[in-house]
Amino acid sequence: MGIFKCLSALLVSAVLLLNLPPGLCGCYKRIFSFGDSIIDTGNFVHMSGNGSSRYKELPYGMTFFKNATGRICDGRVLVDFYAQAFQLPMIPPNLPEQDSGRFPNGANFAVAGATAMPPAYYRRWNHSVPMPHSLGVQIGWFKEMLQRLAPGDDDGAKIRQLLNESLIMLGEIGGNDYNFWFWFGDAAKPREQANQFIPDIVAYIGSSVQELIGLGARSILIPNNFPIGCVPSYLSMFFGSSNPADLDEHRCLRWFNDFSTRHNQALRGEVGRLKARNPGAKLIYADYYGAAMELVKHPGRFGIGNPLVACCGGGGPYHTGAACDRTAKVWGDPSGFANWDGVHMTEKAYQVIAQGVLNGTFADPPLLSC
């Protein structure tokens, strides 16, 4: 009966996930995820309490959920697709139930605006970041949760067993470390100076991976950063009437994509070192940059029109003339766009990226190879 139940679940999942590869029953029992707005499923909105937030209202959530859920997207985000591929319910955000929740299928610690490095790191550069909930803070929440999930585990055996059955998603993280420098910079903060942050950010991500392995994690997904030179908010902010030579053959900002590539090369090297140091762990390097560039290079293949404009926003060449909120213009069916609100991607784009990570086109090894 167990085999037939599993096969039945796989068939249902294949229908629900459209073109995603079928899931694997029992591959992982839970997912724990860390990161920023790319995978936040409600922590930021919870932190805002009764305050106003555009993420609490439509058109956010309009596609799949038909209402706002705290996801900064028109529908599902990457962690949702990974959970469904492994026959798990959608992973809940940590903060709404952090004191009482049992989280049988895992928890999502990601918070919009989170950085990899703690805010104190940037004070030496006379720079500040707006959110204090960096990667280290999120891992601290995770450790507190583990103590609740495995009380009295003096030797750590219960926690190790729990984590051995779990997938850890470490990001994407680090993107905001660079975003806040680029977006809020001035003459005293030239963009080139951000290159100095790359070694420290990558090393911090690496030490976080090692810390999680020390706790008992055995399967960790480590994504790289997106091609920020193709993001509408960057294009509207940094191109304008600049030299056309600033754009590459895809009409993305050459310097910023080169910068993302430098970060990603350093991260891939760090993941290689971590693999050599931890042969018993499965460390999966996910190429979000490469997967996202497929949408830019071959938009028609995925039913995308112009991949460099936002679906929700205002006027202007990149639809970034106004913020995406309940008064904004939705320029069409989000499934025909790669970008949702000028910064974050659409459910359709995340589905394409997830498929590439699950089947291995943009992951080493494939996420579904568990």
Model-derived segments and their meaning:
Residues 2-370:
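Conserved active-site regions of diverse hydrolases
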